[in-house]
């Protein structure tokens, strides 16, 4: 079940500055739109090291949102080699991460509109 984003970390980083929070949301929106297709492409090319590296990078920005389920998917992709996950399992994680990204992207778009 998807829970609403927790922007408290964004406000902490921005020291309450609404304009800065909006900039952080715009960066998050960009990542949510760009990284999932890149992850799918890397998976399709069987570039597993690059996929794990991108999952790590993506996880770093998602960690500040309180999206724990999504963050866990990214951690699972990142650690897929250590955990000996099969290609099928990794593909499922990539698909689920993409679905989560779509949900979050809609929520972020609404938050950006509210701050306009």
Model regions and ranges:
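Short acidic alpha-helix initiation/capping motifs at coil-to-helix transition points
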Residues: 1-2, 31, 50-53
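Short helix-adjacent coil turns
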Residues: 16, 39, 43-50, 65, ...
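Amphipathic, coiled-coil-like alpha-helical segments
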Residues: 2-5, 21-30, 61-76, 83-116
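Generic hydrophobic alpha-helical segments
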Residues: 10, 38-39, 77
